[in-house]
Amino acid sequence: MKFIDEAKIEVAAGKGGNGATSFRREKFVPRGGPDGGDGGKGGSVWAEADENTNTLVEYRFVKRYQAKNGEKGHGSDRYGAGADDIVLKMPVGTLIRDLDTDEIVADLTYHGQRVCLAKGGKGGLGNIHFKSSVNRAPKQSTPGEEGEARSLQLELKVLADVGLLGMPNAGKSTLITAVSAARPKIANYPFTTLHPNLGVVRIDENHSFVMADIPGLIEGAAEGAGLGHRFLKHLSRTGLLLHVVDLAPFDETVNPAEEALAIINELRKYDEELYGKPRWLVLNKLDMLDEEEAQTRTAAFLEAVGWDYPKPDDRFQFDMETPRLFQISALTHQGTQELVHQINQYLTEKKRIEAEKAEAEKAAANVEIIEQQPKTDTGVFKPE
């Protein structure tokens, strides 16, 4: 299936059915009172996050979704039937934006999440509601309300804990294959990866994280060159970026340090927030070099990019803020286990810190509410 991560659609809810104007007409009841029923509600349009849906491709072909109108009311106090709702299944990670107001309508972040995109109109009132002591035979009823209508932009941003960043052919797809069950296409030419791939990295029965591989970036990506710029947005939800560098390119004219600096520059031009995310350096394809050559190239690379952070062999207790460096071979799995274990430790600690921060903010908010309560001179709360 073709991967589509953007689409524009129109949704329109159904109109409510009109209320009925009707009177009882039975034998021996010549002047029966009003018995017009209400109209049925119009159908609404909903979006539902579905973990089994991976792309927005169907919304490229069908662009308008119209719910049915409610039925009109009937005599004998019979209400019109309400119209069925329409439920649009969308991938988890879909951001829905109103094209007219630029308002974010919904951000579908978990399976089963359901959001109303267009609410169906209420049914009109039948004349039975307008009977009074001064008007025993009202002919008044109300029409059903119009349903809501919207033009929407759908944008899929994959949900992953870790994102892989790098030039085409840096070995990102090989890495995600080495550490997860994902099986992206791998070949010895640039732009083998044409759309994002997700892989679940399982540490043990209780710990795992999701890794995302996007098409490689090239210089000028922020201005639209290559494929990667279209998919950089998929890294915006990640908590950690891995910058994968090919330390042993087949083309001897390629300078890994210059390519790495170009990637960082493109990232900064594209989005300062994305540039500011925690980013670790992963030097790949060490299996192509002997140990001495690997160390020589690593030292030259680190000097060229101005790396002044700890190196893998340094005795250093990493903290949450310090970028980390790894030397691996994704093909032979050399160094990959240490990499995934450090990622897992980092993500676990990150979640713990975020949970503590949320609890502290909640406690502070509760204290503020209590302090704002009116008190008596003795400090006891006044009853409302």
Swiss-Prot record:
List localization entries. Cytoplasm
Q: Which SUPFAM superfamilies match?
A: Obg GTP-binding protein N-terminal domain (SSF82051), P-loop containing nucleoside triphosphate hydrolases (SSF52540)
For molecular function, the Gene Ontology terms on record are:
GTP binding; GTPase activity; magnesium ion binding
Obg domain location: 1-159
Needed cofactors, names only, are:
Mg(2+)
Keywords assigned: Cytoplasm, GTP-binding, Hydrolase, Magnesium, Metal-binding, Nucleotide-binding
Judging by the UniProt lineage, the source's domain of life is Bacteria
> A GO biological process this protein is involved in?
ribosome biogenesis
Q: Which residues form the OBG-type G domain?
A: 160-348
Q: What is its main location?
A: cytoplasm
Biased composition range(s): Gly residues: 33-43
Disordered as annotated region, ranges: 20-46
The enzyme class is hydrolase
Which residues take part in binding Mg(2+)?
173, 193
Instruction: Report the function annotation for this chain.
Output: An essential GTPase which binds GTP, GDP and possibly (p)ppGpp with moderate affinity, with high nucleotide exchange rates and a fairly low GTP hydrolysis rate. Plays a role in control of the cell cycle, stress response, ribosome biogenesis and in those bacteria that undergo differentiation, in morphogenesis control.
Concerning its family, UniProt says:
Belongs to the TRAFAC class OBG-HflX-like GTPase superfamily. OBG GTPase family.
Assembly notes? Monomer.
Instruction: Name the chain's protein.
Output: GTPase Obg
Organism of this sequence: Neisseria meningitidis serogroup C / serotype 2a (strain ATCC 700532 / DSM 15464 / FAM18)
Its taxonomic placement starts with: Bacteria, Pseudomonadati, Pseudomonadota, Betaproteobacteria, Neisseriales
